[in-house]
Amino acid sequence: MKPYLVKLIICMAIIANSTYAQIPVLNVNNKNSAEVYLQSLDIQVEVTGNVALTKFTMTFKNRTSKVLEGELLFPLPNGVTASHYALDINGKMREAVPVEKAKATQVFEEIVHRRVDPGLLERVEGNNFRTRIYPIPAHGTRTISIGYEEELPIEGNSLCYNLPMDYKEAIENFSLKATVLQGSVKPQTDKANELVFDKAGTNYTAAFSRKNYKPERSVTFSLPIQKEIPMVSMQSASGSYYFVASCFPEKKVRTKQWSNHIGIIWDASLSGLKRDTKKDLEVIQQIVTETKDLTVSLYLLNNKFTKSGTYKITNGNWDDLKKALESVIYDGGTNYSAVRTATLPDKEFLLFSDGLSTLSNADFFPKDQKVMWPRVRQNDSNKSIHCIVSAAVADYSALKLIAAQTNGKFINLNSLSATQLKEELTTETLHFLGVEKTDNIKEVYPSVATPVRNNFSIAGITDVPQTQLVLLFGYGNKVEKRVLVSLNANQANREGNIHRIWAQKKINELDMAYEQNKEELTELGKQFGIVTRNTSLIVLETIEDYIQYDIVPPFELQDEYYRRMKERSAQQVQTRTSLLNNAIAEANVLQEWWNRDIKKQKSKYPVPDSENEHRQQEVPEILDVVEYQEEMREISSDELADMAFADVAFEEEIIPMAMTKMVSEPSQPQIRITPLKQDSEYMKSLKGKADEDYAVYLRLREEYINTPTFYFDMADWFYKLNDKEKALRILTSIAELEVENASLFRLLGYRLKEYNEYELEIYICNKVIQWRPMEPQSYRDYALALYDSGRQQEALDTLYSVLTQSYATNIESKSCGIEEVVVTELNRILNKNTKLKSSGIEKQLIAPMPVDIRVVINWNMDNTDIDLHVTDPNNETCFYGYRETKIGGRISRDITRGYGPEQFMLKKAIKGKYEVFVNYFGDSQVKASGPSTIMLEIFTKYSDKEEKREVVCVQLSKEQKATQNGLLKVAEFEF
């Protein structure tokens, strides 16, 4: 057999056993839809030295007569990040530019609502990249391009390129071209491969195109090398040089001695369904085969951390353990903070997970025990945690950090062949330990201890064109091998984006300690055009958009951009402003209202009996629909007041709500949450017996697995059955449904507040801040969660920051009205906690304003208009069109484009029944969304020692949303 064929077979065998397809998935209306399909795919591969640039250009066709928005999820391998993004604008591809992630999100969403063409590529949880595309025209197409650089691994004596493909549907137009620049040896492919390389000048190229083609086989080729000689690529940059060096250090075989008492931490959260558990079990099989006799403790991790059992394995028989693992039920969110390995008896641990801790930071170690990266010990227990990942979507950085902090192994089953896996599990791992200090070399990455499996590569910056670098390798902390690398800019490969490979390596290292390195990660992403957690790539349609938002456009637009930037007036610049001045004005209005003496007024002249009868009519108890049109927004308040409740209709379609809660003391006002019947089809199968109903839930979940409403309703069912454990497990599954979905997390946070799970609510609200830092509602929700958990000072400071932070003018505009609500809540905290530090708070805002009744709502969907209505015992209704009642009731401003909040307050309540309604008025969302979730808080004796609160979450039905009218009665209470 020819030598190159041996090398290629080795490469192909490894690829066949180690890869998963990186198939982009397009979602429309939050789900994979046949409405839009991949019409054409062009793939361009360019290899320079040991670095490959891969670009996907995808054209999507809209089959419908509707304009749609799509979200494309693009998973990338461990250590690889997107560095190219382009979108078709007026028939021509336009390159994206890097922007801070929060700003990019805000700009994208604002422009989308003007119905023009922005594009956005952002990194979401794990190593996943999401691009948002709008519009996809009716019966039309949109084209996007995404690219990334990666270093090629060495297998045998060859560099191996592999692009996994497993497309399920045929593509109308498919093409692929691969180019090896300055190639000295012809790339090798197997006979079944459709790529055939030919010489083209100093390069080698291969290309093919097909019609109605279904790409099912990986694209692979190999480049023979001399691995004894380090490969070096260099790129000049402002008098310095970026370099990437790759070598193949010789390894000694050292047998790994596994402990005879191992703990298995098995991620049993909902996302566990996406892991390749067959591969996970193969890992355990390998260890058992080598160790034969051991004791295994099995721990299950989802929203809780529980011990499932202890298994004594003798002579390699682990049938009972295997059966237990194969029967695990995957449900709930993932809470890494619940794991405390130091208190467990096991000597070392195997963690099988995707690294996506949806309910806590991805860290097993409490703050008082945490050690700084890169030192590897959590404490003196010397318990290694080996992190094993088999999921295609994973947070590699989180798992690498846990392994590094505990001197454990990080094992990515998606990148290891069976042979490599066996070697990894049965031998000690060689580590790169650093470099010998050299004066003219700096910024070398990795700079920390790094496992070495085959080849190892390092990147850095040198101030001279020619120097030497010594790499240190060993086992544990002992240096046992030195590798000399010669850097010579005249001899090294000088093509390719070496600077981006360097930046990518630095980003990967800094990302492991993300919280400490946020600012530097942002700077790196912006300078090198790389998508990070803090930076995105954005495409705008017009030069005016780049000017308005102060974003430097791609090269072809920069001359006009800079010329016009000099000419623009101050009015053209998008400004930022705080809410403080508005809050002071609202505080004055509130104080004037609160100080007003409201007396019961009697009509001067007799009132006709027919009018009295009309006023005394009760609003129907379940669901009321007020028949008014959108034009009524423009009618005067007096006219609206006369028309309110003039026509009443009934609607049967309703959605289940939270459990009724009653105030215990008879002397206090009684708040009754209106019980709504369970009309969802899946609820009809439940019988009221928790264990049996849980089995029904699991069976039904197969059909509704990606439907948030299903978990929302099911959780409440079990909560009503007083099975809070199952309720929380089901509820927290919502966090696993979609990466970085703030609307889902807001929904989850509302329900957690209702269930008094305040610590978990704090984490959920804090994640929303990370994703939506541009919105005041994010900080308000977080502040109120802090207060509920007893952290009053932190809550006060955070709530005040809602008013003092600066916001873009469009955000400030659609949040107008939140100031009054925040002022009310600030004064409540101060009134009930007199020892808090408040010297930094504007004095004009402070005025105790206790009231007998306060009702407040907010909702989870942006660009949505939901209204609060409160009817008093006199049958007088306070709502946006009739903001003050005769007995002193007052409602805040109508928020029509945000998340709320809206509040009703009554200083002195009269005796009688009060009824609370909500009305879905409409939305301006570009893409269809699930039902809006409303959180309603009802207070009696607000800001008083006798204060009582009830919380209820309500989901509006699709039918009610579609009609854009109707009142839903959610509560009533006697005062």
Question: Over which residues does each language-model region extend?
Answer:
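N-terminal, polar/Ser/Thr-rich
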Residues: Y20-G49
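Generic helix N-cap/helix-start motif at coil->alpha-helix transitions
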Residues: I673-L676, Y704-Y711, K724, E738-F745, ...
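VWA/integrin I-like adhesion module and closely mimicked acidic/polar interface patches used
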Residues: S353-Q405, I411, K422-E424
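Short beta-strand-loop
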Residues: V296-A324, A342, L359-F365, Y396-I402
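An acidic, Ser/Thr-enriched
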Residues: H84-N90, E95-V124, N128, R132-P137, ...
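Von Willebrand factor
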Residues: Q257-K312, V339-S353, C387-S390, A394
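Intrinsic-disorder/low-complexity signal
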Residues: I829-F975
